[in-house]
Amino acid sequence: MARKILVWLLSFNAGFVDTAGFLGLQGLFTAHVTGNFVTLGAALVFGTQGIIAKLIALPEFLIVIVLVRLIGTALTTRRLPTSRIVLAAEVALLLAFFLLAVEFGPFPDSDSPTALITGFTGVAAMAIQNTIQRVHLAGFPPTTIMTGNTTQAALDAVDLIKGVNRKQGVAIRARLASILSGIFYFALGCAAAAGLYFLFGFWSLAVPVVVGVATLALRAES
């Protein structure tokens, strides 16, 4: 049960950080990094801010994943608690994201050095979360990207409606429940970020830090 709650909290955080980053950094996606291709195109067409930030987000994301993979392998070789250490690194980056955003924001120019550094910390945190999900929570649906989850949920719903055998039905229902809960908490994070950012600006990024600390506590128990 602790691992299931951990996944819910990670889904909430991904939705929150992605939405807050988008609102505060001129349309920069921190979790859904490939979405920056779309917003980059819009920035080029309409001449809006954030071209550099969107252009380098994906390379930054990939570099962090490579580093986390290499460090994680080294930690595992030394029989250290890899997942907890990596998760702690994500929480540290979320804290840095919050502190930098509060200190230097708002960012009328999201391509300024301070905005780029702030955005990078958010992207790096979500890159680590993606790696955690793929390596340490592979049995659960993704926590940061909901397109694939939504597709699988629709396919599972169709299969249940048209009818499957008992064994398949049990497996499909369990998977569908897991997927829908992830989508729900991601959407809840998005909604919470929108409301709290409207009220408190970048101070709202304290929420993912608190949630991140909770995930650390849960990971220690599981």
Residue ranges and their predicted role:
Residues 1-222:
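Alpha-helical transmembrane segments of multi-pass membrane proteins
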